[in-house]
Amino acid sequence: MLGRVRPLLEELVAQRRALREHQDRLAEFQARARGNGGVARGPEVVAAKQAVDRLTAQIRQGIQEIQALGCVLKDLDMGLVDFPALRDGQEIYLCYRLGEERIAFWHGVDEGYAGRKPLEADQA
């Protein structure tokens, strides 16, 4: 499953970064225009707005793809995804953060990232 989720997550993180860059650029255009008593216009503004719209749609699509796999995207900035699982008959989340080699942590459904425990501890 991680083999399918990881590339989606990598793409989402890159798209989120690009979205923020375009949003910042658009905000700069708008601030300059307001400072001059006008409205932001022109091809650069149109291109930035189109990029924001396109990236927003792509991010939504990527999130839906991750959810369709049964995973829960917890934090896009961290690249954090939970995989529902059972441990001793209890519902838990297997927890993965982008950049980790494999799924090596878990936490209870009422716990978050701070409550992660190593899977190896269960095998000792």
Question: How does the language model describe each region?
Answer:
Residues 1, 8, 34, 41, ...:
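Generic structural signal for short, flexible, solvent-exposed coil/loop and linker residues
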Residues 1-32:
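Long, hydrophobic N-terminal alpha-helical segment
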Residues 9, 16, 56-59, 63:
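A structural signal for well-ordered alpha-helices, especially hydrophobic packing surfaces
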Residues 16, 33, 69-73:
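Short secondary-structure junctions and interdomain/linker hinges
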Residues 22-56:
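Structured domain cores in non-transmembrane regions
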Residues 53, 60-124:
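Glycine-rich, aromatic-bearing surface loops/beta-hairpins
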